[in-house]
Amino acid sequence: MFAISKLSPLLLSLVLLTPIVRAQSLSEAQVKSLLVRVAERRASSPDVHADFQEQKTMHLLNRPIVSSGKIWFHAPNKFRREITGNSPSVTVSNGRDLWIYYPNFKSAEHYFLGKRSPVDAAIAAINTALNLENVENTFRISGAKIDNGYDLQLLPRSASMKRTFQKFDLRLNNDLVAERTEMAQPNGDHIVTTYSNQTRAAIPASTFEFAPPRGTEVTNPLGR
């Protein structure tokens, strides 16, 4: 069994979430109805593109790390996440492989998905925030209706998910797209991500493929 500590800190920071605001609580039936609406919206518009800003408070650091960039997502499990600024990175998954590329260091990490490793648990959490497909199988869900959308609190069912994060809160806007997410990890790390300029325009399939540039040092942290 792979240890979660072997994963890249950037990979672990990808899971996205939000705190619950006191509002009109949803019944179990209302939560199920909301998830049906999300599924219908996803079926008609499987693509999401947004800008994001993220703040990570890590137990080993005195100051939070703030980053921003863009994210592209195609349901059910393809995404691309580009962080800009002084420490840029590109994270791409086509549903089978995951790449994390660091252009400043000309290095890339390559992970193979579907091996029931901690990587799969982390990616499942990312997909949950942006997709919510089959979310009831993985999480116990409660929530509330707020003026501009919904706040959901997701508690992981599986041991692998519980090792990845302790708290997973998700805010959806009225278009049923992630607006803010918050995650607390068992090690004390805390990540808050906010999204803006969300669109559902079609995204080219090539967006979710990655080939490391010539001269890139490629590593496989978890092997094959």
Q: How would you name each of these model-derived features?
A:
Residues S45-D47, V66-S68, H74-P76, N86, ...:
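Extracytoplasmic
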Residues S8-T18:
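Bacterial N-terminal signal peptides
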Residues A125-L130, T138:
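Anionic-ligand binding region
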Residues K70-A122, I191:
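An acidic-aromatic
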Residues S25, E109, N134-G223:
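Gly/Pro-enriched, hydrophobic low-complexity segments
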Residues F2, V21-P64, P212-R224:
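N-terminal leader/targeting segments and the immediate start of mature chains
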Residues M58-L60, F79-R80, S87-S89, I100, ...:
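Short beta-strands and strand-coil junctions in structured, solvent-facing domains, enriched
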